[in-house]
Swiss-Prot record:
Its EC number is 2.4.1.-. It comes from Arabidopsis thaliana. Belongs to the glycosyltransferase GT106 family. InterPro entries: FucosylTrfase_pln, GDP-Fuc_O-FucTrfase. It is found in: Golgi apparatus membrane. Glycosyltransferase involved in mannan biosynthesis. Pathway: Glycan biosynthesis. The chain crosses the membrane at residues 7-26. This is Protein MANNAN SYNTHESIS-RELATED 2. GO terms for biological process: cell wall pectin biosynthetic process; fucose metabolic process; mannan metabolic process; mannosylation. One of its GO terms (cellular component) is Golgi membrane.
Amino acid sequence: MGVDLRQVVAGILTITMFVMLGQMLHRDYFDAVQEKVQGDAHDIEFHGSKVAVEDGLVRAFEAGTKGPWMEDSHELKPCWSISQSDEAVSSKGYVTFSLTNGPEYHVSQITDAVMVAKHLGATLVLPDIRGSKPGDEMKFEDIYDVDKLIKTLESVVKVVRKLPSHVSLRDIAIVKVPTRVAEDYIKEHIDPIFKSKGNIRVTTYFPSVNLRKSSQGAETDPVSCLAMFGSLELQPAVNELVESMIQRLKTHSKKSGGRFIAIDLRVEILEKKNCHETGAVGSKTCYNAQEIALFLRKLGFDSDTTIYLTQPRWESSLNILKDIFPKTYTKEAIMPSDKKTKYLELENSEYENVIDFYISSRSDVFVPAIPGLFYANTVGKRIALGKPQVLVPAEISGTSGLPANYISPYISKKNHLAYSCFC
């Protein structure tokens, strides 16, 4: 029996179409889904989505001369401006709060506290920093620059270093606010409590980890932009440490022009999630070391690529990644010896979380192997810094893939909240 060549070609095209459609469905889950937080932030699920690639991103990859690396774009400038109506007013009382759960949460917590204090006409009290374990507390100045915070916010809200002695903690009402709290919510739900008690303590909860910008036509509050992207900077000693670690990574990356990849991959979280399938074609909630290694190799990153992992300490399950990419390091391998006693003495300390967050924000490529606010807020900082190469993991059928196809939808679709604040 003869074979009709046209039927064969049509069959091949049909199969190819279904493969491409499956990949697109997989990636469309990445940040289109509103993920709910239940208790521990690490329970948040994460979905991949293959996105339509913009011409500019494709050209950026094609223009590069060193494989899959994407050139940085220019740093964006703040679009927000503080009007007279936004300026600080005389204080009526105090707003207190704490920074908890790591720097990816600090960004949202400081923003919500500033918004509440601003729209209540209250004075903001400098927060403390609390770790995941009871009694694990630090001063704000242990990690962040106090003077920078006060100076940045002085035009919109007054900040004091501590609560006056005449204010009793028993007289402070505890108020829970949803992240990205808006002025209307503050007026309706918080202002009556503030007027009744005179002082409040704000705790932020996260009904969603979505950081997509508001719907078209809706304006982002300039005070929110200022607080989220302008208020938190590392204090000099911590910043110097982060810079030294980045320079060590660049030194290991001479063959790739000093460029390196940061991967948010923590074994404890991967084991908790079990990397189960979600039901979308090929989609997963997280990716382990072997899957990430294959993903990067198929995108064209060679074995000489330097990789930084957020994993606190090396574990045997990471060996496969180091077998494929020998220049793979955790923080203990690149931190100066004289700094380890202070910054690595406590496992999962706030110092370690901060180091991970700021190195991931500054790396040439960022790969989120696990979901959550770490991914979303790291992308926000990278957008402001002009570092758009955030590659969302996926199982690539075949032997290779185009890096531009795996750029985070936050960037390829320009729907991250940061695009409302920078231009």
